[in-house]
Amino acid sequence: MAESVITSYFPSQIASDQEKQSLEYGTTVGRAIEREWFNNDNGNSRFKSNQVSFHNLRLYARGEQSIQKYKDELSINGDLSYLNLDWKPVPIIPKFVDIVVNGISDRQFDIKAYSQDPYGVNKRTKYMESLIRDMQTKELNEFAEAEFGVNLFENNPETLPKNKEELDVHMQLSYKQQVELAEEQALNVLLDGNKYDLIKRRCNYDITTIGIGAVKNTFTKAEGAKVEYVDPVNLVWSYTDSPYFDDIYYVGEVKSVHLNELKKEFPWLTNDDLKEIAGQSVSNSGFYNRTINNNDEDDSNTVQVLYFNYKTFTNEVYKVKETATGASKIIPKTDEFNPPEEMYEEYGISKLSQSLEVLYEGVKIVGGKTLKWELAKNMIRPKSDYTKTKMNYSIVAPRMYKGRIESIVSR
């Protein structure tokens, strides 16, 4: 019986950390992504197929789809001279798309922050207990103030709740600590600065029309946390059955970048490097169908750049040595550290290690050289499991099945 052979163009995941950090490893990853998405051996690449499919769906959603198929059905041997029809498409789908997008884009919530630390909880509890005391001794306090001029109220008697229900509402709506107000304000400023509502509406429109939406999360010291809209037409990702893309091991996007912007991003590029990159872009323009996004002719000063994340793992290794005083000294080591068994007993040496998921960031000219490959400086890790990490791209395709994406417009 013949054995099945699975061909993979990606480098080994069990390579050493030193090998994974090399530029050659990143170049191999970039070429493997190109092999999966931009390979034209069968006459049509996966990337170009997505471009054409998403472009046609967006035309349908705008009521601007091609009418040639309608003419072919009504014509007789290609003759339309006897027909006097208005061939402009009836904009039926756009109305329903707007209804769906507007319905799911309505923001029906406000940001509310509640302190959960012991100090904040204790402060809230003391305030609530003071309100209860004032409610229980209200008549006595009013009598003391009227007869003796002594104010025994701990809070303003005019805003004092009358019963337990009003007390619960007051604690939920009226009471706010300064740290909670500051947190709410910070989150609102963050959302407003990133144009959250506009990006959310664009993602909702993409999910409705083409069945997939995406954003990119980044962090810089100058701008802080940033959320950027990503056009799904330019996305590449590893195969997944999950509509939330939470099990992919690589993801990226193709951007059309002008040479002057590329020079600012990578100052070490020389004029010869830029000429070589521009030549690679023109010779490999078949990878990327510009006519969908740009009606102009190919510009040799604009290149297609692949920005991608690659998920793998690293081994945190420590050497534990027992000192003369009986204490333990922990020394960081590379993943190649593997002392023989004799040293464990003779010198009191032991080894500690754990595996962590990590992200590598890469930048590659499509069909050309690799410009960047390094361990990501900022990684998103869930608090529940520090060993896990998340991609910088957040993608969702609610009606995806077996890798096939479906949308309301496509149905």
Kindly give the residue locations of the regions a language model identified.
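Extended, helix-rich architectural segments
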Residues: M1-N392
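Short, intrinsically disordered, charge-balanced linker/junction segments flanking boundaries
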Residues: R399-R411
